[in-house]
């Protein structure tokens, strides 16, 4: 992780150590993503964050979680990406007029200043939300809270993400239903999150996000 986040995580050092030891100590249960990817979202320097996409927890399918909310490794065939990401790409094409990305890896967004942060940083394979309440939410709340004063726009897909953004004090929130197949047709499709974020950034006289993925 980038050193700029150290002061944010310092108060949680003992809590993080306990969490990681608990995960490593339970030999009967695997967890996702790999340990070295748990804080991967924080490779983006704190002062380079332009906008945030708040996720729920990592993909629970082996080989999919890589420490960036909604992103999958570039080695995953585009036809095999998770349904939520497929729907994100459908809205991406509709909103921006871009072509279909060739992979589900969202590293290009990170390079442009998008913090892809799950509120829960680990999960048991095949068990969505299995690590809810273990303590990650308190840690990621601190990460997000450290960015509030910059008045950054936030993409919040689903009520849990929206409620978290509101509770933490974000004012520029682009909210819609979650892109999962269960809710995408209830208002995610047509919500234009990417262009709306750029409109907010431009109104703040900030550089817009280059959302284009290859």
Ranges and model annotations:
Residues 2-156, 160-168, 172-175, 179-184, ...:
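A polyanion-binding, active-site-adjacent surface
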Residues 186-190:
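Rhodanese-like catalytic fold shared by cysteine-dependent sulfurtransferases
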């Amino acid at each position: 992780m980038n050193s700029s986040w150290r002061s944010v995580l310092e108060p949680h050092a003992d809590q993080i150590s306990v969490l990681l030891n608990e995960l490593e100590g339970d030999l009967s249960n695997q967890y996702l993503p790999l340990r070295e990817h748990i804080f991967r979202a924080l490779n983006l320097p704190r002062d380079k964050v332009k906008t945030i996409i708040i996720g729920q927890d990592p993909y629970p399918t082996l080989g999919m979680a890589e420490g960036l909310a909604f992103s999958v490794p570039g080695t995953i065939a585009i036809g095999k990406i998770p349904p939520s990401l497929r729907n994100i790409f459908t809205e991406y094409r509709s909103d921006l007029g871009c072509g279909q990305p060739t992979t589900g890896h969202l590293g290009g967004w990170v390079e442009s200043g998008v913090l892809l942060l799950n509120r829960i940083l680990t999960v048991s394979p095949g068990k969505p939300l299995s690590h809810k309440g273990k303590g990650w939410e308190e840690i990621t709340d601190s990460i997000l809270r450290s960015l509030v004063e910059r008045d950054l726009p936030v993409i919040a897909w689903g009520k849990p993400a929206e409620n978290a953004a509101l509770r933490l004090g974000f004012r520029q929130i682009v909210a819609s239903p979650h892109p999962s197949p269960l809710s995408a047709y209830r208002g995610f499709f047509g919500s234009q999150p990417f262009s709306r974020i750029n409109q907010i950034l431009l109104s703040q006289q900030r550089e817009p996000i280059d959302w284009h993925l290859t």
